Amino acid sequence: MASGSADESAIPMMDDYQTLISTTDVELLKTAWRNEKAAPEILQFEAALVQRIKEQIELAEQNVEISEADNVDPLTVSLYQMDLDRTQFLLRSYFRVRLQKIEEYLFHILKTDHLLNRLSKQEQVFARRCTDDLGNHLDDTVLSKLPDNYQSILKQSTTSETDDMVPEPRLDTFVICKAKQYLSNMDFEPDYSMEITEMEKDLLTFVCYKFIKKPLEMGKIDLV
C-alpha cells in the first residue's frame, strides 16, 4: 500500500514535468543543433531556448531523484532518465559545435562585430581568453624570434593589406536545406535573387549557403 501511495503522489509531479519539458523545446533544440552543425559560420546563440532547456533539465533531475526516493516503478523512472539524458546530450552537443567554430574562426569572429554579437556572454569571454592565450603562446615560442616585419599574428608581413593569416568560414559551401514555407526570390539576398528564384515548402534543396543566409537567419529555412 505504501508503494502504491508513493506512486500516486509522484504522478502529479510527473505530469508537471511532462508539461514543462515540452516536445516543442526539444525539437527546437534539435533544429538549432542541426543548423549550427551544418552552417559554415557561427549562428545566433539561442539564449531564450537554452535557458528554458536548462530549467527543464533541472526540474527533470529533481523529479528523477524524488521518484527514486519514493520507489516509483523503475521502468517509469528509467524512461524519464533516458529523456533527461537525451536533452542533456543535445544541449552539450550544441555548445560543443559552437565552441569548435569559435576556436576555428577565433580572430575573424572577434574582429567582425555582427559575428561577435551572435555569441553569448560566456562565449565572448571564452573567445577573448583564447585570443590572449594563443597570442601570448605564439609570441613566446615563435613570433618574438622572427624579424619585426613578420611578428604579426594576423598578417604574413607588415606589407600585407589584409589580415591574410586569419581563416574565415567559406560561405560558398553547399548545404542541404528545407524551407518551412514557400519562398520567392524576395525572401533571398538581393545579390543572389537571380541565382535562386523560389523554394517550395518541405522540399530538400542543395544550394550555396550564402544564397540562403537571409531566410535562415529569419527562421524560414532549416539546414539538414
Where are these regions (language model features)?
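Charge/polar-rich, low-complexity and marginally structured segments
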Residues: 2-184
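Surface-exposed beta-strand edges and their flanking turn/coil or helix-capping segments
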Residues: 99, 106, 117, 189-192, ...
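Short basic/aromatic-enriched segments
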Residues: 175, 182-198
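C-terminal structured interaction module
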Residues: 191-224
